[in-house]
Design a protein with these regions (language model features):
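Short acidic-hydrophobic, aromatic-tinged amphipathic segments that line or gate anion-handling sites
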Residues: 48-54, 167-168
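Rossmann-like NAD(P)-binding element
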Residues: 53-90
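Internal alpha-helical scaffold of NAD(P)-dependent oxidoreductase catalytic cores
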Residues: 133-219
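Interdomain hinge/lid region at the active-site interface
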Residues: 202-278
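NAD(P)-dependent dehydrogenase/reductase Rossmann-like domain
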Residues: 247, 254-256, 260-323
């Protein structure tokens, strides 16, 4: 079979969007879901899908993408080991260290390169998916030592063809970063929604843009939010401690002086810096040969400083560097 064959295990929001986007980019795709109703919906939309993981993994040369919630990874991997032990394997799970450890333990012969598209909505399920979900998004591609350069290039190429740009990162650095910018926001949104509701009917009647924006992700499926937050416990605890320290300082200042200048100004400057970095043109570039001995280390270094991969040709990648 062609190397541009993709098998997606799990057809919810992210897996379903991946199936759609990859098919639109010219990949031959097949999806697998446990639910017969989901498979019927996928087939009705014109895609190849099955409830049988053995059937889904029948193409020996397919790139296999795990798109299941973190707790289900350890249930799926033994079946991958049984039917496709030497496969090219990636995933779209939002926590990377537990997945990498599970792959090493349960499918040690797989050629694994992890992934995480930083995209989503508060909705879930196949019907919520979209072929354009990843357009303009960051897509982490795991760049730990030992990653197969051919598989790395294929996973990065898939992300690029789905409309994303690639951020090369090590698993530990990824988990620490997303604890702050993804998992903590989900937790804070849950707290904010509860605090607002605690104000009763009047508070809810007056709630407007700031409350709606701040609590959007609190509408996500609770089981999925718990899975990613609890699965990144150590990194999230550090982020929570940082947030509590800042809230404590704000409370202390408000109680003692009535002022919140330091907290509000720090947040304002941080948001402006984020917007500026996102909008700044990237004029500096670098090319990396993925077969070079230090390629992965260099990719991690550049990724940690905001660089992104914008093209991959065979085993050479082209990066735009942060200004």
């Amino acid at each position: 079979m062609s190397e541009r064959t993709l098998c997606v295990i799990g057809l919810g929001l992210i897996g379903g969007s991946l199936l759609r986007a990859a098919e639109g980019a010219g990949w031959k795709v097949r999806g697998m879901a446990r639910s017969a109703a989901v498979v019927t919906a996928v087939r009705d939309a014109g895609f190849d899908a099955t409830t049988s993981i053995e059937e889904a993994l029948a193409d020996d040369d397919a790139l296999v993408a795990l798109a299941v919630p973190l707790p289900a990874v350890v249930d799926v991997l033994p079946m991958v080991a049984r039917h496709a032990p030497y496969c090219r394997l990636t995933d779209v799970v939002s926590v990377k260290q537990p997945v990498a450890a599970a792959v090493g333990r349960l499918v040690p012969a797989a050629r694994y390169v992890g992934g995480h598209p930083m995209a989503g909505t508060s909705a879930s399920g196949w019907a919520a998916g979209s072929a354009t979900l990843f357009t303009g998004a960051s897509w982490v591609v795991g760049s730990d030592d030992g990653a197969d350069p051919v598989v790395w290039a294929q996973v990065a190429g898939l992300a690029l063809e789905c409309g994303a740009h690639v951020v090369p990162v090590g698993t530990a650095d990824h988990d620490a970063a997303v604890a702050r910018v993804s998992h903590l926001p989900h937790l804070l949104a849950a707290v904010l929604a509860s605090v607002g509701a605690g104000g009763g009917s009047l508070a809810m009647a007056l709630a407007a843009g700031s409350f709606t924006d701040g609590t959007r992700v609190a509408g996500s499926q609770p089981e999925l939010v718990r899975a990613m937050c609890e699965g990144n416990r150590d990194a999230l605890l550090a982020a929570v401690d940082d947030a509590l320290g800042r809230l404590g300082a704000a409370r202390g200042s408000l109680a003692s002086t009535g002022g919140l200048a330091a907290t509000i100004q720090a947040g304002h400057l941080a948001r402006r810096a984020f917007d500026a970095a996102r909008d700044t043109a990237r004029d500096n570039t670098e090319h990396i040969d993925l077969t070079a001995p230090d390629a992965l280390a260099r990719l991690r270094e550049l990724g940690n400083h905001g660089a992104r991969v914008v093209a991959v040709h065979d085993t050479c990648c082209h990066l735009e560097l942060a200004s």
